[in-house]
């Protein structure tokens, strides 16, 4: 594997050396006509006279500059397309033998286009690489219709959705989730599930965040950008969806756009159900003998959110204000109904087998409310500005509840237990950001952030007493806890562009205080530390529409409260969990090198990445009592990931767009903890083939297939699996009404198999989703204004929707 990566790196550098720099032939830079800000996310297309397809395509750098080189002599027209802006088309210009064309500043005019006005569209590229992030376009992914951000990300390179519906990126679930640059109400996969796909413009995956961003998150930040471009007047959208799994979602968004102000109101009612069949086989080896379990049965989960949101914004010539609020009830539930066959072989005696039905009900939910206030003032039109924001989130009536019971096959209760964890939470975040342009193409950014998280609660447990026939509280299990985390951060970033070269260097300092107070003796902890986190991003534009990007970021993953909770809980009668108050943060060095090549409407991208993590946190499983296992979190040692991510987008015909994504990396974990773990390594890989077919002006078909390779931990491994999806979208009534039918895992090939092997524990787990999983989504958009008729004339190669 290491030799393969070395050869791939050598080939990549050989390509770069072959593409020796030459002078530009065409250049310019893009800015927003209203606020003068540089635009770094647009498609710049070069058309030769009498041709309807572009001969070259590129995207601007972080300062808005774009370049074309190796362009033959001739007469050309430049076109720039970006969602929410008027299409720009230059006047024809001629390139002669020694001529160069400098188009200078191109002002992009914000487009007053409603949600339904998709006549001005062609195919959108699903993935675009930028200096410090990759951008996933949402609306062109049919499998996301009626779903959430999870469904949109499922077709992204290096992203996996495991058997429990949880998202991992390059093997890790350690990422932060933001919505429009603000922290999500929830965390991880649950946060992604709360955002309806129909309201998403695009998703930014920031794998090596700059010093401006939070340092939390092992593999970076996922920032969801919601739709904001509307016609003047009243606009809106409504989405309804349902599935054969009884998943149901309804969401709406209404917007009133005036000359200088805007208000919006939105809401959703979502129940995202997952259903599967579980098989479990385990054997624990103890001094007195062995305990074997053979279990199977259905499992069902639900991630739910019932909420309303609203906001108001005011845009003056040099100053903007924004107020947003959201409130509702959300969380997740889980139910399992497993048949357990327990066989005990003790003291050399004959095996004794008992059969039970284990029913488990779990819920973790809260009432939440959050609000934010933001203001930004521009001192001039050259990027000199200051911005401030304040965010608050309240979580009340928070309850974590679990009920377990064992019954014999006649339905008589043999044992039972339940626990309750009542909590109160709040979060504060304040930001102050200042930007000072040093020159036309360089700037200095600096800022301060205050973050505070507070949680207070208590925990109690009840066990079934067969003599009294009631559940009785266990005083020895009662625990009160208090947790507080406060972080003060400062940062400074310098960035600039020099001809073909882009650079951004940053430094962030953070002082962190964590306090854990518990009624359990010797379990309270107080920690304080100051740390420095650097970041570096470099970009170089090569001839023939090629670009190379280099990035480095130093990050951390701080333990969540449930990692540290020092009391015993039970997932079911055979699975216990306890926290570790002494767990330490992880520290991650993340490096990437990305190469991009555009040829016409096609593109190729390759990313080499390396990640080194110190004090890796992993869930460990050990024998506890009898057949019961005990899970806990621990710093197991170090791990390394080195790999290559490749994306090839081709547009072979007018009606077919295909994307091939592949990810292969060598993973190695060095175990430094004597808990049955071991050193382990594996070659992990996953591949995705996505196909979009235009079957008519209003009909589109999507076919995709995914293959996910095996992976390892310090205690075991997971097997490979594959699945295929198909979806069709039909638009009606001048594209105001859209219906999408999606069929996931068509061949019922998806399955999760995990195998744990230690000196005293052997455990095999198999999870297979229920079949079939078919989702129907109906969307309606409305607007009080029509699209500008001049834009239809500018639209070349109209396909279906989106902007290329």
Task: Specify the residue positions occupied by each region the protein language model found.
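Short, acidic, small-residue-rich periplasmic hinge/interaction motif at the N-terminus
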Residues: 31, 43-47, 81-83, 100-142, ...
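Outer membrane beta-barrel strand-and-loop segments of large Gram-negative receptors
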Residues: 296, 418, 427-431, 472-479, ...
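Short acidic/polar hinge/loop motifs at secondary-structure boundaries
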Residues: 149, 155, 182-208
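N-terminal periplasmic accessory domains that precede
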Residues: 105-106, 149-151, 167, 190-191, ...
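Surface-exposed extracellular loop regions of Gram-negative outer-membrane beta-barrel proteins
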Residues: 224-237, 277, 281, 294, 513-515, 544-590, 610-631, 744-759, ...
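Transmembrane beta-barrel wall of Gram-negative outer-membrane proteins
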Residues: 25, 242, 246-274, 289-336, ...
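Short, acidic Ser/Thr/Gly-rich low-complexity loop/linker segments typical of extracellular
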Residues: 49-65
């Amino acid at each position: 594997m290491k030799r393969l990566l070395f050869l791939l790196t050598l080939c990549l550098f050989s390509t770069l050396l072959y593409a020796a720099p030459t002078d530009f032939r065409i250049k310019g830079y893009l800015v927003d006509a209203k606020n003068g800000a540089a635009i770094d996310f647009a498609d710049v297309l070069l058309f030769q006279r009498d041709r309807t397809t572009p001969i070259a395509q590129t995207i601007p750098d972080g300062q808005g500059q774009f370049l074309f080189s190796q362009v033959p002599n001739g007469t050309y027209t430049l076109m720039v397309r970006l969602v929410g802006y008027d299409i720009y088309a230059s006047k024809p210009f001629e390139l002669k033998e020694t001529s160069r064309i400098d188009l200078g500043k191109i002002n992009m005019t914000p487009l007053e286009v409603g949600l339904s006005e998709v006549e001005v569209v062609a195919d959108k590229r699903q993935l675009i690489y930028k200096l410090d992030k990759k951008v996933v376009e949402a609306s062109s992914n049919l499998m996301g219709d009626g779903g959430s951000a999870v469904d949109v990300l499922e077709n992204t390179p290096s992203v996996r959705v495991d058997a429990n519906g949880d998202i991992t990126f390059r093997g890790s679930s350690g990422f932060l989730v933001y919505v429009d640059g603000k922290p999500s109400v929830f965390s991880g996969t649950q946060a992604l599930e709360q955002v309806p796909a129909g309201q998403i413009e695009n998703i930014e995956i920031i794998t090596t965040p700059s010093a401006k961003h939070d340092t939390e998150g092992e593999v970076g930040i996922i920032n969801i950008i919601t739709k904001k471009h509307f016609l003047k007047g009243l606009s809106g959208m409504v989405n309804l969806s349902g599935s054969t799994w009884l998943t149901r979602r309804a969401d709406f968004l209404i917007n009133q756009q005036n000359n200088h102000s805007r208000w919006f109101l939105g809401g959703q009612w979502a129940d995202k159900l997952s259903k599967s069949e579980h098989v479990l086989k385990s054997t624990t080896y103890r001094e007195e003998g062995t305990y074997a379990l053979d279990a199977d049965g259905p499992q069902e989960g639900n991630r739910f959110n019932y909420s309303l949101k609203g906001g108001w914004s005011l845009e003056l010539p040099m100053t903007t204000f924004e107020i947003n609020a959201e409130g509702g009830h959300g969380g997740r539930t889980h139910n399992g109904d497993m048949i357990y066959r327990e066989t005990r072989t003790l003291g050399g005696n004959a095996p004794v087998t008992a059969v039970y039905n284990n029913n488990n009900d779990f819920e973790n939910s809260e009432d939440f409310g959050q609000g934010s206030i933001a203001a930004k003032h521009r001192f001039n039109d050259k990027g000199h500005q200051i911005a401030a924001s304040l965010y608050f989130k309240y979580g009340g009536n928070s309850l974590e509840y679990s009920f377990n019971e064992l019954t014999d096959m006649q339905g008589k209760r043999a044992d039972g237990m339940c626990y309750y964890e009542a909590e109160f939470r709040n979060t504060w975040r304040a930001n102050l950001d200042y930007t000072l342009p040093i020159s036309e193409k360089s700037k200095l950014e600096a800022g301060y952030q205050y973050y505070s998280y507070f949680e207070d609660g208590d925990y109690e447990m009840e066990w079934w007493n067969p003599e009294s026939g009631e559940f009785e509280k266990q005083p020895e299990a009662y625990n009160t806890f208090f947790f507080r985390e406060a972080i003060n951060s400062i940062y400074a970033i310098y960035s600039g562009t020099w001809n073909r070269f882009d650079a951004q260097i940053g430094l962030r300092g953070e002082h962190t205080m964590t306090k854990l107070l518990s009624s359990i003796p010797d379990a309270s902890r107080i920690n304080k530390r100051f740390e420095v986190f650097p970041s570096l991003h470099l970009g170089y534009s090569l001839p023939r529409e090629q670009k190379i990007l280099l990035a480095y970021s130093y990050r951390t993953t701080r333990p969540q409260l449930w990692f540290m909770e020092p009391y015993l809980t039970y997932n079911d009668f055979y699975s216990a969990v306890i926290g570790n108050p002494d767990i330490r943060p992880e520290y991650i060095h993340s490096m990437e090198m990305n190469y991009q090549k555009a040829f016409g409407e096609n593109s190729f991208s390759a990313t080499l990445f390396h990640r080194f993590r110190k004090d890796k946190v992993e869930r460990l499983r050990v024998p506890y009592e009898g057949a019961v296992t005990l899970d806990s979190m621990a710093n197991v040692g170090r791990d390394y990931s080195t790999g290559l991510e490749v994306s090839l987008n081709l547009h072979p015909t007018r009606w077919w767009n295909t994307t091939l994504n592949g990810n292969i990396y060598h993973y190695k974990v060095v175990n430094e903890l004597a808990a049955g773990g071991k050193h382990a390594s594996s070659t992990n890989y996953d591949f995705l083939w996505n196909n979009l077919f235009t079957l008519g002006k209003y009909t589109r078909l999507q076919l995709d297939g995914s293959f996910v390779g095996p992976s390892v931990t310090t205690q075991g491994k997971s097997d490979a699996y594959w699945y295929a999806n198909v979806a069709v979208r039909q638009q009606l009534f001048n594209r105001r009404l859209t219906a999408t039918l999606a069929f996931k895992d068509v061949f019922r090939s998806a399955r999760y198999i995990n195998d744990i092997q230690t000196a005293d524990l052997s455990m095999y787990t198999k999870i297979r989703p229920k079949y079939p999983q078919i989702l129907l989504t109906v969307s309606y958009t409305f607007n009080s204004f029509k699209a500008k008729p001049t834009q239809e004339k500018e639209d070349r190669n109209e396909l279906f929707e989106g902007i290329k």
